[in-house]
């Protein structure tokens, strides 16, 4: 989920959310086994099988696969004194559960996106797409129709609303209830998925394009993200990562309808560090050189994401809002005066806390006629809204993103999979 530099937005309204195999019939070759057509057994249909189940059943020891390990290329990250080693071993023991939670979330993320990739095709509605993602996430984490974890709704599950931004829309779009937008063959769709376990969020995204004419655009952004992952490390300045990303992305061109476009970084979109139950932890990882001398630190958890565009390379907010999150400053603000806003805030606190949410999630919880109250919470700074972020109409944008963990000796690309 992107960290946008542009912060203003517009509010409008809308609401409400919404195989089997047949085996061959085998008969004996013996004449005695012959039966009349009227006595033939009916073919029995197998019950539907569902490979999506609570992932804890697949890993009964609760030890989840590690991500891709990468060396730091900065020498100072490779040299540690004995005292530092001892301190790390103490911290490492304390951090094991955190790392394991991240790895659990990442394994669920890989399985969720594979499930979607097997089903994705043109002419699906975007609502169908996000339901496939989010229902699978709930089942893998054990938060499903059976009501598991209802007493602890924030313990694990969806990390933020599934982004399915199309074409010139780069980020922060998920369908509201009643949205009938259809994914077409000629579309470029960014799929941004979040999974959280005990508040530790795995944030990873890729771009879907059925038409091969967009291949260079996708390749540019994929390579730019991989460059950002390679450059990231302890004590690395954020501006240096942005400079490396920019150089790679701008080296690509894409030809569309007879016109050649240089792929441009969306310069006001960034990666970010991630804090417990908070998708944007305070540091932004630029995708262009911006002079930010802030450094990455040991133990931090970053989403390295890049966005490339055939347009201006600059996004502005616009369109119907779907993404929201409780503000970091909310607890220090006066309580809402509207009784409906108070009850809605209670629902938000109990089910999301500071995790991002969308209108569909409120619908799913049985909330109705809440839009005025929600806008009131936004107006008073208690809730932050995140409108869709768009480049110019007619342009195409792509995104790739990985979550990394900065260990003392190496970094772990926890969300890496066979797909990207």
Swiss-Prot record:
First-listed, main subcellular location of the protein, grouped into a coarse class: cytoplasm
InterPro entries named among the record's database cross-references: Creatinase/aminopeptidase-like, Met_Aminopeptidase_Type2, Pept_M24, Pept_M24_MAP, Pept_M24A_MAP2, Pept_M24A_MAP2_BS, WH-like_DNA-bd_sf, WH_DNA-bd_sf
Disulfide bridge positions per record: none
EC code(s) of this entry: 3.4.11.18
Gene Ontology cellular component terms for the protein in this record: cytoplasm
Gene Ontology biological-process annotations: proteolysis
Location within or outside the cell: Cytoplasm
Residues given in the record as a divalent metal cation 2 binding sites: 203, 272, 305, 401
One Pfam family cited in the UniProt record for this chain: Peptidase_M24
Binding sites annotated in the UniProt record for a divalent metal cation 1: 192, 203, 401
Record keyword Cytoplasm present: yes
Catalytic reaction list: Release of N-terminal amino acids, preferentially methionine, from peptides and arylamides
Region (Disordered): 1-48
Function: Cotranslationally removes the N-terminal methionine from nascent proteins. The N-terminal methionine is often cleaved when the second residue in the primary sequence is small and uncharged (Met-Ala-, Cys, Gly, Pro, Ser, Thr, or Val).
PANTHER family in the cross-refs: METHIONINE AMINOPEPTIDASE 2
Family: Belongs to the peptidase M24A family. Methionine aminopeptidase eukaryotic type 2 subfamily.
NCBIfam families, A to Z: met_pdase_II
Identification of the protein by name: Methionine aminopeptidase 2
Native source organism of the sequence: Lachancea thermotolerans (strain ATCC 56472 / CBS 6340 / NRRL Y-8284) (Yeast)
Taxonomic placement: Eukaryota, Fungi, Dikarya, Ascomycota, Saccharomycotina
